[in-house]
Amino acid sequence: MTRIAIVDPQPAVRAGLAMLLRTEPGLVPVGAANDVHDGIELVERLRPDVVLLEHHLLDGDGLSLCRRLKAQPPAPRVILYTAEPDGALVLLARVASADGLVDKAAEPAELFEAIRVVARGGSALPPLEPHDLDAASHLIDPEDLALLAMLVDGTPPGDVADTLRLDRRKVGRRIERLLGRLRAGTAAAA
């Protein structure tokens, strides 16, 4: 059984996802939250295997929530489940250490498969296209290029810190700064 938590600001989406997940053998919705604060509490209390997470939340940013969830052992697997899965979000999802990204317009079978893949330890992130990196390159400080390259390749932040011989807290701050710049740049381009 794969235990799933849902974090989405829309009550109908939370309820609909829970009903949909109950129709699929082996997938069990265990709880839902509508914002960052409640999402953290829910995950700490229920310890789901997978979190379905909207990146636009009422009290903050789902990407930062993803990073927080992934930093606390035992870290759940996280799938960004969003209506805006563009190339910029693929890059942001990788930087935030998300395990998957699924469009809310996808067929249920695609969502179920993504959940199963990430629950087994795999990745359900779409490929990153070269133009996604090109569009973001002007937003990135030269000292963050190595950090970004490692994150995009799927290297966990702790391993990034060890490889770059940096303090883990400093790497965390640099990742948050990088996420902020990329979010601001992609919002300005929209």
Task: Locate the predicted segments by residue.
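Short hydrophobic/Thr-rich beta-strand motif most characteristic of the beta2 strand and flanking loop
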Residues: 26-34, 42
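Acidic catalytic/metal-coordinating carboxylates
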Residues: 35-38, 61-64
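Short, flexible helix-to-coil linker/hinge segments that flank and couple to helix-turn-helix
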Residues: 89-148
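Helix-turn-helix DNA-binding segment
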Residues: 134-176
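Basic, Lys/Arg-enriched C-terminal extension of HTH/homeodomain DNA-binding domains
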Residues: 171, 175-190
